[in-house]
A protein has these predicted regions:
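A membrane-interface helix-boundary motif in multi-pass transporters
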Residues: 134-152
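A late C-terminal transmembrane helix in Major Facilitator Superfamily
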Residues: 107-139
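Multi-pass alpha-helical transporter architecture, strongest
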Residues: 147-174
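Helix-to-loop junctions at the C-terminal end of transmembrane segments
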Residues: 39-51, 136-137
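Intracellular juxtamembrane helix-capping segments at the cytosolic ends
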Residues: 92-105
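Extracytoplasmic gate region of multi-pass secondary transporters
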Residues: 1-40
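Structural signature of the two symmetry-related core transmembrane helices
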Residues: 54-69
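Helix-loop junctions at membrane interfaces in 12-TM secondary transporters
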Residues: 72-82
């Protein structure tokens, strides 16, 4: 969530950097919303069919692609692709953020697990705003920031792929 929060808070910086009209990103949020809602509906089916453990490594691939779009593209219409891709990742994240924990640890302590993960999520959004602000204050371009975020996402996806097999679901006793 920290990347999306940083992008949302500093959307005027993005627009200015890309020489887009002021309202391009706010208008593109409609695509974000639609992509997020469609993904929310479809990801439940995908979790039931494939399991969260198999899907979680690909959850942030659209976010990685959004950073590639932000890095390379200057055209205003790319804002719609950029936010649409973020919406897809956020839609997956909303479903996988709950179902993964239930799959791995069961539901007995799901309330405590969700409380802890939600606290981390809230902290990460605050951290994202600070990180983006520090980078912008230190003259990082939006392309530099997109590269840093993309690298972080790529490392995260790689770690998930490496460790995914070690997180076996719990066996329920009858």
């Amino acid at each position: 969530p920290w990347i999306f929060t940083g992008m949302a808070v500093y959307q005027s910086f993005i627009s200015d950097s890309k020489l887009w009209e002021t309202y391009t990103i706010p208008k593109a949020f409609m695509v974000y919303s639609i992509a997020s809602i469609v993904t929310l509906f479809s990801s439940g089916y995908l979790v039931d069919k494939f399991t969260s453990r198999k899907l979680i490594p690909i959850m942030n691939v659209p976010l990685l692609l959004a950073m590639v779009v932000l890095f390379y593209s200057k055209q205003e219409f790319s804002a719609y692709f950029f936010l649409g891709l973020i919406g897809i990742s956020n839609g997956f994240g909303n479903i996988l953020g709950s179902s993964t924990w239930a799959e791995i640890y069961g539901v007995k302590y799901i309330g405590s697990i969700k409380a802890l993960t939600t606290a981390f999520m809230v902290f990460s959004t605050a951290l994202g705003t600070a990180v983006f602000g520090i980078l912008i204050d230190n003259d990082f371009t939006i392309e530099n920031i997109a590269f840093i975020c993309g690298s972080y996402i790529l490392i995260s996806i790689s770690i998930l792929i490496l460790f995914r097999k070690t997180l076996e679901p719990i066996k329920l006793e009858n």
